[in-house]
Amino acid sequence: MANRNVEKLASIDAQLRLLVPGKVSEDDKLVEYDALLLDKFLDILQDLHGEDLKEAVQQCYELSAEYEGKHDPKKLEELGSLLTSLDTGDSIVIAKAFSHMLNLANLAEELQIAYRRRIKLKSGDFADEANATTESDIEETFKRLVHKLNKSPEEVFDALKNQTVELVLTAHPTQSVRRSLLQKHGRIRNCLAQLYAKDITPDDKQELDEALHREIQAAFRTDEIRRTPPTPQDEMRAGMSYFHETIWKGVPKFLRRVDTALKNIGINERFPYNAPLIQFSSWMGGDRDGNPRVTPEVTRDVCLLARMMTSNMYFSQIEDLMIEMSMWRCNSELRVRAEELYRTARKDVKHYIEFWKRIPPNQPYRVILGDVRDKLYNTRERSRHLLVDGKSDIPDEAVYTNVEQLLEPLELCYRSLCDCGDHVIADGSLLDFLRQVSTFGLSLVKLDIRQESDRHTEVLDAITQHLGIGSYREWSEEKRQEWLLAELSGKRPLIGPDLPKTEEVKDCLDTFKVLAELPSDCFGAYIISMATSTSDVLAVELLQREYHIKHPLRVVPLFEKLADLEAAPAAMTRLFSMDWYRNRIDGKQEVMIGYSDSGKDAGRFSAAWQLYKTQEQIVKIAKEFGVKLVIFHGRGGTVGRGGGPTHLALLSQPPDTINGSLRVTVQGEVIEQSFGEEHLCFRTLQRFCAATLEHGMNPPISPRPEWRELMDQMAVVATEEYRSVVFKEPRFVEYFRLATPELEFGRMNIGSRPSKRKPSGGIESLRAIPWIFSWTQTRFHLPVWLGFGAAFKHAIQKDSKNLQMLQEMYKTWPFFRVTIDLVEMVFAKGNPGIAALNDKLLVSEDLRPFGESLRANYEETKNYLLKIAGHKDLLEGDPYLKQGIRLRDPYITTLNVCQAYTLKRIRDPNYHVTLRPHISKEYAAEPSKPADELIHLNPTSEYAPGLEDTLILTMKGIAAGMQNTG
């Protein structure tokens, strides 16, 4: 039996190597990393569940690998027979094992990317920027701008000082991996990285081997499934943990790299600490669009918790700074302040660890920083009191109420050190601290509020009806605007205590009350989703005025659907034409564009092109009115929701639309991929800043008129094709719900938000995330590619010369190239054979021809795509990405087959399966075995024991393997 196992392990390794598309490069370690983690895991699986269960995992892998090699549907049926013959406990273990192996494969790939990056940095050899696996390095970008594009170092420095990248973390429910597991994955990644370090000793290796074994086993023993949905407060705490763990220290570390990169192009001064190069905002606890769980109380709690956390992080660092600032020499300004503070200081403060006695005046910096420490302590305690009790006795003068109060003494210390010739000391930890304060302020992040436009209409309708002037809801757009402007120009209050309020109206008004009560630096933008007209913006301005919000939030319309994007330029023209509004915005406006809903509404092709045109148009209009426009990009993680490699997405934006100001969402699982580890955080900050700078200083070309004309024609055809299938095909919704796990999506408990805006309804009411998620699970990715094939076919059949034009567009126009490359990547991850299996098992016989026609469309679209890109095979220009996908495929295929058969058993209780006896012989004589315990983790399931957990585990595993949920 032992020899047989060695053979099995060898065969897995052999299959791995067969799947790799040739030797990628000399620095290719992916297969090595992957095989090491796999070997460790299989040993653990055998220890915990027996040799035979490990063999079942290997059998599944081999059948999947054979299918991936030959695409023989019989192999899927063999695999299905094997999986359905397992008892429920073993099924859970198999699903859990493959999900776990995919997470390990992701860790191996992350390490491979980091390893290759280090090699390239050492050698100075940077890959082609058009390649989807590489991104801009800040130093390389500076050098390219100066040496290849003839920009002066001063021009680069000035552009960088005037640049702002604002990353907005959202609680979109696409993070399917529990936080407990993410932390364990981080430790596995660290162990593996250290194992491959050059200077490792035999003892180190042994200890790291043990640690790796321990962490892999701990992850496997952790329940992957969230048993209850997270609350908005849970989501906010999870989001804030990234600041505590990586972003807080990552920002000053990154800014030091910026200093170094500037020095290397001849700029001999540091990047100013108060230049807002990187800013952070959040939607966690502020996004109430379709989420009834985000209440005014939640928003208040989230803001106070963030302020408490921020002052606590500053407080935990201030004593280290006091230890460092031991110098006695200072300028007269600081000496006078220190003596004044010394006279009024408390004698002993016993609750401090360091410097608890009165600090003598011959340590002037410590005296100043001691006062900062006292105020930070009080600021933290006051936030805690307000959070817990709703009130605090600590007075305003004892705390920091705005960031300028905290910066002032720190700047005084910095100036004094520089005046005394101690620049080198000033530019150490003190500069890092100043940069943190400038970036994070007192609130850590600025909380955006997002609300549906219809909620504001409801409130104003209640007001106008109460005032006896008619129904606001029924007024025309012109009448609404006229009334809103009249009220905004006047001073009469509109809301009295006797206003009749529904629950929804009260909730909306109470949100404005919270905005008025809390410090203004807690908040960022007020975003109106489903914005369609000028009155939507004026309505929020009026409600802010009504609640006397001291510093009103900037109001940001979010244009999402195709028709709204088309109407956006006219709406912005009308707004900018209003004298009252132009005075209010003071030359600055932000507009948000939604990638998710526009894609769901019209398909990826038409949405991408309309988003491009809308950006061009609204930027042009803003310029005409002398307004600086910031475009806020609401991008998801998946290609279907506007995702893709950051640097490529930015460099493909229309010229003159970023202009040094970028605001973009970082959603769900992308937060972990961007900030889960220190090196990931560093890479994320670098890629956003470098790509934004490059877009401004070396903008992409504008499309030629004939390209625009062709794109317009193709977009009409693509939209028609997409909508004819998704909205006009009478039985499409029925097919979609049968062929995918859409109905079961909510059981994953991955977000606080319901998956539908309205409990009943079809595709229109379904949120973009479960819409994309469902098709990602079946590896058919319909929302991404549907419409492309019809558009290309129409263009080429109309005029054969158009093929040449499309190929030229691909070679020379970044927007078009990126659009095609991202869809090509999705095709590389796709597998219509899995969709065919789902149809065979889950779809009624009369609907199967519909699925067949969609799969024929898939193949035709893929062929057109390859023709336009000039590729013989998918991803032929990106061997590393191709390798990573092909290594994962056999794991994902097992989970796809397991999911299809589990759905069959859930939906058809009469479906007959023949169970084989306990496959773990070690436990055959015992009344139960370790796998049986897993069934009892979900005692309340409405399905047969174990089926629901098996299904959820397959969903999570496939999401990990595709590296996308929704």
Curated annotation (Swiss-Prot):
**Localization terms from the record:** Cytoplasm
Modified-residue entries (Phosphoserine), positions: S11
Tissue specificity remark: Expressed in mesophyll cells, but not in bundle-sheath, roots, stems and flowers.
Record: active site: H172, K600, R641
Q: Which Pfam families match?
A: PEPcase
Q: Where does D-glucose 6-phosphate bind?
A: W283, R450, D597, R635, T665, R753, R767, A768, I769
GO biological process terms held by the UniProt record: C4 photosynthesis; carbon fixation; leaf development; tricarboxylic acid cycle
The record's listing under PROSITE patterns reads: PEPCASE_1 (PS00781), PEPCASE_2 (PS00393)
**What InterPro entries does the entry give?**
PEP_COase, PEP_COase_bac/pln-type, PEP_COase_Lys_AS, PEPCASE_His_AS, Pyrv/PenolPyrv_kinase-like_dom
**Required cofactor(s):** Mg(2+)
Homology family: Belongs to the PEPCase type 1 family.
Q: What does this protein do?
A: Forms oxaloacetate through the carboxylation of phosphoenolpyruvate (PEP). Catalyzes the first step of C4 photosynthesis.
**What else does the entry mention about this protein?**
Ser-774 is strongly involved in determining allosteric behavior of C4 PEPC.
Record text on subunit structure and interactions: Homotetramer.
Q: What protein is this chain from? A: C4 phosphoenolpyruvate carboxylase
Organism annotation: Flaveria trinervia (Clustered yellowtops)
